[in-house]
Amino acid sequence: MQLNYEKIMKEGLTVLSSGTTGKPKKIYRSPKQLIISFQYSLAGQKINKDSRVLTVTKLTHAGGSLLQTLPAMHIGVPVKIVTFNPYKFLDQVKDYTHTFLPPAHMRAITKTKSWDTCDLSGLRIVGGSDKVSWDLIEAYVSKGAIVQPNWGMSEVGPFCINAEYGSKTKIDKHKKHQWILGDNFSVEWEIVDGQLFVSGEQCVYNGWFATGDLVFEDNGVLYYKGRK
């Protein structure tokens, strides 16, 4: 599947939610809403004219289309879209600066023969669609990558809460609890009875949105506990 950027920017885009807040839903984003979310995604991931994006995830979901692919197209950044293959990925990504990987993809890559000798310096990997474990973050940072575990939803925006790791020092600072949500925020947030509520211009709904995620804060950092 490819994306028709010109058509999308005229008509908007419908993506499928992951189903974490109930049955998977079709979420429509207008051209205006897309541009707003692009601005957050570009700034938060440091995607600029010198970047190159490799997309290996489904374009029907926000992670595949809204997180990096369309924002990069919006500013004329080269984008290559391929089907994920863990055995080919490390060769494919050598010429790119940004990619998005769910944790299952990240783990599959570490099990290939090429993993032990790979050098991921200059690559920024945003992880999401599921919880990203500390061992995966550490593994990719040890290979030279910048790793950004990211929390977002089709309903509230693809790039909302995340952390950025490029060294063991910051990992050790945050690794006091099991599942990181982040300390960088592109939405307003509050915790009510343990549940995360978010609001902001990326959201397709007005007012506060109940995410269904149970979280807690520790010194300005949000951590994930489970689902409501």
Placement of each model-derived feature along the sequence:
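Conserved ATP-binding/catalytic segment of the ANL
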Residues: 190, 195-228
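Short beta-strand-to-turn element immediately C-terminal to the catalytic PLP-Schiff-base lysine
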Residues: 28-30, 159-164, 192
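Alpha-helix/helix-capping structural signal
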Residues: 32, 104, 130-131, 202
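AMP-binding/adenylate-forming
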Residues: 25-48, 52-110, 148
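Conserved adenylation A10 loop of the ANL superfamily
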Residues: 11-27, 228
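Conserved pre-ATP/AMP-binding loop-to-beta segment of ANL
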Residues: 2-16, 46-52
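Active-site glycine-centered loops adjacent to acidic/histidine catalytic or metal-binding residues
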Residues: 20, 129, 152, 213, ...
